[in-house]
Design a protein with these regions (language model features):
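A surface/extracellular/periplasmic glyco- and lipid-processing/surface-interacting theme
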Residues: 1-178
């Protein structure tokens, strides 16, 4: 129940350099203010959804992945380009380098996980073309880091469960070391 339409303009604002409707911005601080005002919990006793890979990983048997292209749709294709000096991927969308709206820095990632999931158009009577995605069960995917990729299995037993990412020898991705 927090959204940029019903809240006031002090919590959400439009970035004039971007095209509407995808130009509404906010901050973590503003979201927390709204959550506190509405009496929402802002802490959790659940463990983190992701176990981040913090050590350097060498996928020695991996496939070269200097450029990773992800077609979300015909008009929305994301590309990640690997920089061997920084050991990070830079994100491009619609053939333009993406930058942080506040800092102007390139959007980058050390690790990329791609998960192939089934999606379909919702039959909700409104015919808005909204999509539903099946994120539970075992799915195929890729773990990408340091210019290489390996196939993985993505396992999620329920909607509220944490997704577990494993290589094809059943080893959790966060346990793959140099």
């Amino acid at each position: 129940n927090i959204n940029g339409i019903s809240e006031t303009t002090k919590e959400f604002w439009r970035v004039k350099e971007k095209k509407s409707p995808h130009n509404v911005a906010t901050s973590t601080e503003k979201i927390l203010e709204i959550a506190n005002d509405k009496g929402y919990r802002t802490t959790s006793s659940s463990e983190s959804v992701l176990n981040y890979v913090t050590e350097e990983v060498d996928l020695e048997n991996g496939t070269v992945a200097d450029t990773v292209t992800i077609p979300y749709s015909q008009s929305n294709v994301v590309k990640w380009e690997y920089n061997s000096e920084t050991k990070r991927y830079t994100r491009y969308s619609r053939n333009k380098k993406q930058t942080d709206w506040t800092t102007g820095e390139d959007v980058t990632a050390k690790n990329i996980i791609i998960e192939f999931i089934a999606n379909s158009t919702l039959n909700d009577g409104e015919n808005k073309g909204r999509q539903t995605m099946n994120t539970t069960g075992t799915k195929d995917g890729y773990y990408i880091t340091n210019g290489k990729s390996i196939p993985i299995k993505c396992e999620k037993v329920s909607r509220s469960a944490k997704t577990v990412y494993k290589d094809l020898s059943d080893k959790c991705v966060e346990n793959i070391k140099k």
